């Protein structure tokens, strides 16, 4: 689960991390009132969406008068903001963050992520703040410094100080940087975050360490322990199809292809997408119906997939272990009839009640294309999507 920048900063402040003063706003008038409340002569008007690259897309503006605050708030609220992370369709901006301006002397990067290789939280830091960290990793990897944090000891003073010096924190600001990194780690650990990024972390003109931005992702499997974080969820920022799928315990992720996939098991689902790509096709989604899918769940899965107008064909790939092939066959037929299926449908199933499932499909009277293995299924669905 993702949250907005202003929500991430609320979490950081609870752990002693310094951030600019600011207020979330949902209207132009609220934005002006927030600037008046903050005082000063410079404010930053920031679009709040779940994507990076907002500044380059025109979603972050520096205002030097209340009139400019009003103008920029009016421009940004309601705009469709397109960044390298939103895709060409962009995101509709429905909320803003109005912050006090900052005197920036140096921009740094600090992030944390769960590292599967070391089975620890990895702290990553760079002197190249304000840039896309993937770009830095590709072109100047020597500028990224890492610490793999021992969960029993936490981030040690010596580790934090060493990282701070490597990324160019002024010597007099090292204690602040240490406190920041240890606060960030504590926030990461106690909220069950899967990713935290501060980009940029700045050194101000008077050598203060301030988190100018904040990005948090959380482990969805741990949200039951954090109702206060669940309350931060913004459904407007999520794919409606993924929200609908979650209501039926379906794991659904939208992709940009034209072949719908309905599979049981995450591993088989990924293998199915790989084989589709191998045969020249492009999957439109990842959809795992799980091991205990019912006819109702399969029907709902079809409905969700077919809301995507780009889908030209559907592949159902089922291994009947806990999931029986005859149940899937009944669900496929019910779904095809209920949604008035108009795109080609390829079904490959193997395992428990396989022959019964195939018999049910054959006797359904529907134009279902069957396949005996994954390669055959992928080839048939790719050809069908291409109108062959």
Swiss-Prot record:
PROSITE patterns: ATP_GRASP (PS50975), SUCCINYL_COA_LIG_3 (PS01217). Binds 1 Mg(2+) ion per subunit. Substrate binds at residues 264, 321-323. Pfam families: ATP-grasp_2, Ligase_CoA. Pathway: Carbohydrate metabolism; tricarboxylic acid cycle; succinate from succinyl-CoA (ligase route): step 1/1. It catalyses: succinate + ATP + CoA = succinyl-CoA + ADP + phosphate; GTP + succinate + CoA = succinyl-CoA + GDP + phosphate. Succinyl-CoA synthetase functions in the citric acid cycle (TCA), coupling the hydrolysis of succinyl-CoA to the synthesis of either ATP or GTP and thus represents the only step of substrate-level phosphorylation in the TCA. The beta subunit provides nucleotide specificity of the enzyme and binds the substrate succinate, while the binding sites for coenzyme A and phosphate are found in the alpha subunit. This is Succinate--CoA ligase [ADP-forming] subunit beta. It comes from Herminiimonas arsenicoxydans.
